[in-house]
Amino acid sequence: MSLAVVILAAGKGSRMNSNKPKVLQTLTGKTLIRHVLSRVEPLNPDNIIVVTGHLKEMVEADLADKKVTFVEQKEQLGTGHAVLQALPYIKEDKVLILYGDVPLISTDVLANLIKSASDDLAVLTAIVDNPTGLGRIIRDKFGAVSHIVEEKDATDGQRQIKEINTGMYCVAKSHLDDWLPNLGNTNAQGEYYLTDIVAMARGDNISITVTHPVEEFEIQGVNDRIQLAQLEREWQKHIAEVIMSKGVSVADPSRIDVRGKLEVGKDCWLDINVIIKGHVKLGNNVVIGANCILKNCTIEDNVKIKANSMVDGSIIREGAIVGPFARVRPECDVKEGAVIGNFVEAKKTILGRGSKASHLTYLGDSEIGANCNIGAGVITCNYDGVNKHKTTIGDYAFIGSDSQLIAPVNIGSGATIGAGSTIVSDVPADNLAISRARQRHIDTWQRPVKK
């Protein structure tokens, strides 16, 4: 059977007190609506419809790279009315209905909901400790679902019910064609509730199947920044537990932030306040110090990233050491056993096997061979104000402290650069190059005297 997915994303989210629509608030570094799409796309639906409303242009811009159809709900008249706007654009047999502000529903739970629907109606419900504000599932004396009542319309007795409606359904398109045009708005909100299709299904003797999420956070919606922060911590705790189960030690599971995809080896150690962005791969026995940021990088076995360091878009090879207070910018390849030390910045640089830049250095657009020593304060001067230029350093070279290498320049293997030199031309292999003013001693000099 063909499948359409309808994602409701028209709400204002006034409690966010924001200039952005609610679905564009971010969780783990990604907008809420993109979280929902990332969980839907593996289902390979034939059609994805996003119902927009408040600041629709911003939502459309955020999803410009996605293959979706946008449908506008011009008036906010309820969830049933929102799905009704999408109905003319649905040609598929089944319809999965989701919410753009419920970001963490898992693909597996959705797949089970779709499977359970068969040709009829499947409802995702959950039993929660605190159902306040949520629609309650009303069952008959035989335990079958009869209808859903919203909190504002519920009696005191119904408000004691712990089973709640998540708002997620999978239903045959033919049933929506029958039910949605007949929704009423005689309720406390004066809105057209999508929840009323459950009672309609019951009235038409349509089978109603109930499925449940695995984790409660999967069905948690976001209405304000407090809930957003709480859900962020719930999700980060879940991620921490997952990576710990794979053999990673986390110093404090409440102080880790994974804002992308993290692949881990065994026996790694993550200290407090580590932030992961994009796609990060960690090998075995990797140590990440406190307050580090890793983004779109590969960290191989036995690497140490010391405290307060950043690695972005680069690869750190086996046994290398980075930091503390180091910054590895995109397109770097730090080879096996190499060292990027404290207050060293590297950009688009290959640092060869066993080479060391231990302190206070800038390496940009550089290719450095094996077993080199880069002294403190060395600068590769790669930018002429318009273009970037390359510095090449051969194996076993020694670059003395406080030297400037004016690119483009080649330093031969085994060459030595005297401390404090400014190198403007190529240095042959095994040569000493020194470029600095001759030291003078003036024994007749006297300090000035204050008058």
From Swiss-Prot:
Metabolic or biological pathway: Nucleotide-sugar biosynthesis; UDP-N-acetyl-alpha-D-glucosamine biosynthesis; N-acetyl-alpha-D-glucosamine 1-phosphate from alpha-D-glucosamine 6-phosphate (route II): step 2/2; Nucleotide-sugar biosynthesis; UDP-N-acetyl-alpha-D-glucosamine biosynthesis; UDP-N-acetyl-alpha-D-glucosamine from N-acetyl-alpha-D-glucosamine 1-phosphate: step 1/1; Bacterial outer membrane biogenesis; LPS lipid A biosynthesis
HAMAP family assigned: GlmU
One Pfam family matching this protein: Hexapep
Region (N-acetyltransferase): 247-451
Source organism (scientific name): Francisella philomiragia subsp. philomiragia (strain ATCC 25017 / CCUG 19701 / FSC 153 / O#319-036)
Top-level EC class: transferase
Full protein name: Bifunctional protein GlmU
GO biological process terms held by the UniProt record: cell morphogenesis; cell wall organization; lipid A biosynthetic process; peptidoglycan biosynthetic process; regulation of cell shape; UDP-N-acetylglucosamine biosynthetic process
Organismal lineage: Bacteria, Pseudomonadati, Pseudomonadota, Gammaproteobacteria, Thiotrichales
Residues reported to bind UDP-N-acetyl-alpha-D-glucosamine: 8-11, 22, 73, 78-79, 99-101, 135, 150, 165, 223, 329, 347, 362, 373
Subunit structure: Homotrimer.
InterPro entries linked to this entry: Bifunctional_GlmU, GlmU-like, GlmU_C_LbH, Hexapep, Hexapep_transf_CS, MobA-like_NTP_Trfase, Nucleotide-diphossugar_trans, Trimer_LpxA-like_sf
